[in-house]
Design a protein with these regions (language model features):
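Pol beta-like nucleotidyltransferase catalytic core
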Residues: 1-32, 36-50, 56-58, 62, ...
Length: 403
């Protein structure tokens, strides 16, 4: 995709933007020339209160936007809010959503003679995807190629409709970056074909179930993956296991990931900004403060706040010192949100077949974590650590992910 700047159409008091440069979302393709990527992009559209400046001085031809943006974020280089495909950014902007992709569409018969289909038009990608395609062919995998690279089929077809009739789809990205998972992968899921991936090293985080994706991590994996493809093609029961999620539903992990996109990234940006503004207001001496704990006999009652991911308003939860555990918090959250007859924010977006009827807690985590931390790495090791967190953070704030 081309080098692009997008204006963030949100008015924010200038006093909150002192020494900050936010409002510019930049996206690059890994095939951009160094000279183009290094060019500063200065944009002002009547925004008197702030300068929108993005200078890509860290560009390397082997790196994509994540490698440019995140070091600036981590190193305190002046960007207050980062929006990229990375789940480690402040506001992730992924390619996935329930509304854009009919992920639970039924599986069709595999009628094509070739085992796999490929749609690759950028023949100058910075990874080894063309070598992978050639390596699979040398290993005996028959491939119908509809794109501009290695074309042997007429490319004037509906991509998803064509993919439905192949056992495998070559979901080969143009760069191998964490969380950079594009429509190539999600269209494969819609089509009910098994994705063979060259791309994100953590593609398993995006898999709808264990064993549903084949991953070529490096060139040496090509022969092994080709052998697996042939095995699955010759053993229908084993192949059908790879698509079992289409009939029984994807994992909670997958649902929790895609549910994030039920709230548009621009709305999640607003929630982030509003949360920061509120936190600054709460630190003010003039703000009315509710007590964070009180005594009741020999017990201490702790007041904490919880909101569903993708929403702004908090709900009050009270925990007793005699049962100050994560499980107690989960139980209290379910009780409170059931009482409120809460409808999960993702419910209108999810396919009806996998919505479920009862609230279930997937994750509860301290407010302020990235989605990578919240979904995949953060945990309270035990009751002691949870208690320490509550005691060290008066009126602790949490987010909950329902599935």
């Amino acid at each position: 995709m081309p080098c692009l700047t997008l204006e963030t159409l949100i008015k924010i008091p200038s006093s909150l933007l002192a020494l900050s440069r936010i409002g510019t979302l930049a996206q690059w393709d890994a095939s951009l020339d160094m000279s183009l990527a290094r060019r500063p992009m200065l944009h002002s559209a009547g925004l008197k209160s702030m300068e929108q400046l993005l200078y890509c001085d860290l560009w390397n031809q082997l790196n994509t936007m994540q490698k440019i943006i995140l070091p600036m974020h981590d190193g305190g280089r002046g960007y207050d809010i980062i929006m990229t495909t990375s789940l480690s950014s402040d506001v992730p902007v992924g390619y996935f959503s329930w509304s854009e992709y009919d992920i639970m569409a039924p599986v069709q018969q595999k009628t094509e003679k070739a085992l796999a289909a490929a749609f690759i038009s950028n023949c100058g990608a910075r990874n080894f995807r063309l070598q992978a395609l050639e390596g699979l062919e040398k290993s005996g995998i028959t491939i119908d190629s509809y794109g501009g690279c290695h074309r042997n089929r007429d490319g004037r077809v509906d991509k998803v409709e064509a993919l439905k009739h192949y056992r495998f789809s070559l979901a080969f990205e143009n760069s191998n970056e964490e969380d950079y998972v594009t429509e190539k992968f999600f269209q494969s899921l819609v089509a009910g074909t098994v994705p063979v991936v060259v791309g994100a090293p953590n593609i398993e985080d995006f898999a709808p179930s264990p064993g549903s994706v084949l991953h070529i991590k490096e060139i040496d994996d090509i022969a092994v993956v080709a052998k697996k493809m042939n095995f699955l093609a010759e053993n229908p029961d084993a192949y059908n296991q790879s698509l079992r999620w289409k009939y029984e539903g994807p994992s909670d992990s997958f649902k929790a990931l895609v549910d994030m996109a039920a709230v548009h990234s621009s709305c999640r940006l607003c929630i982030l900004l509003a949360t920061r503004i509120r936190e600054n207001e709460e630190k003010s001496v003039e703000s009315e403060k509710r007590p964070c704990k009180c005594s009741q006999g020999s017990e201490t009652i702790y007041h904490v706040y919880v909101r569903e991911r993708g929403t702004f308003e908090m709900e009050s939860i009270f925990l007793r010192s005699s049962n100050l555990t994560l499980e107690a918090l989960k139980s209290a959250v379910l009780k409170k949100f059931d009482y409120l007859r809460h409808v999960p924010i993702w419910k209108p977006e999810r396919p009806e077949s996998i919505r479920g009827n009862n609230l279930r807690v997937y994750k509860i985590y301290p407010l302020g974590l990235t989605q990578r931390q919240a979904l995949y790495s953060f945990t309270f090791p035990g009751p002691r650590e949870f208690r320490s967190h509550i005691e060290a953070n008066p009126c602790s704030k949490f987010e909950v992910i329902f599935v």
